Amino acid sequence: MLTKALILFGLLALAQGYSFTSREVKCHVCKAVVTELEEAIAKEDPHKMADVSGFRLDAQGNSISKKVRLVKSEMFLTELMEKICEKMDDYLKATYKSNGKFTLLKMIINGQMNPDSSLVDFVQDGDLNKSLGHFCNEVLEDNDEIFVKAFQAEELGNDLDIKICSEQASYCDESPVQEEYDFDGKEEL
């Protein structure tokens, strides 16, 4: 009986060591969503076009038709966002062994176990990480227009996760990396 109590106390103490806010979790979920969307879009043919004609008619009664790249169409992006939260089942909450910093770790990358899994301690979660899917749905529901507009941009950029998750949705506190300043082309004062 004493052994069971000590084990239970040890597990509770271990679980108490991992405290992070829902904002931190949403930050990492938001970044994971951006990554998953980027990967899903990269798999599509960038030249495939979609007809986005509405129910508008011109003066002669013909429907007005407009074609856009499929990966930039609102319909495609919305459908993709509706499915993307299922990917959160592939992630686990973890903390880095080196600094105790919270992260979400995707378990399988390119059909292989994530090599970073040896660098982290996995967080035992009472809900078996099902909250990640709920956080994903919440992030997308609250920011669906932000995601669509960002992914419709002609150039996505390298720091799209920071632009969406930090600058617009305000889940993270990161800022984009500044461009390097060219000292060679400038005169001294």
Swiss-Prot record:
GO cellular component term of the entry, any: endomembrane system
A GO term, aspect molecular function: protein-folding chaperone binding
A Pfam family recorded for this sequence: DUF3456
Keyword line: Developmental protein, Disulfide bond, Endoplasmic reticulum, Signal
Disrupted gene: phenotype observed: Formation of embryos with altered dorsal-ventral patterning, dramatically decreased levels of ea in the perivitelline space and reduced processing of ea.
Residue pairs linked by disulfide bridges in the UniProt entry: 27-172, 30-165, 85-136
Biological-process GO terms, alphabetical: chaperone-mediated protein folding; maternal specification of dorsal/ventral axis, oocyte, germ-line encoded; polarity specification of dorsal/ventral axis; regulation of protein processing; regulation of protein secretion
Location (main, coarse): endoplasmic reticulum
Residues making up the signal peptide according to the UniProt record: 1-17
Localization (cell): Endoplasmic reticulum
Short motif (Prevents secretion from ER): ranges: 186-189
Source organism superkingdom: Eukaryota
InterPro entries for this protein: CNPY, DUF3456
UniProt domain Saposin B-type: residue ranges: 23-176
Family designation: Belongs to the canopy family.
Function: Involved in embryonic dorsal-ventral patterning which is generated by a series of serine protease processing events where gd processes snk which cleaves ea which then processes spz into the activating ligand for the Toll receptor. Required during this process for the secretion of ea from the developing embryo into the perivitelline space and for ea processing.
Protein name: Protein seele
Gene name for this UniProt entry: sel
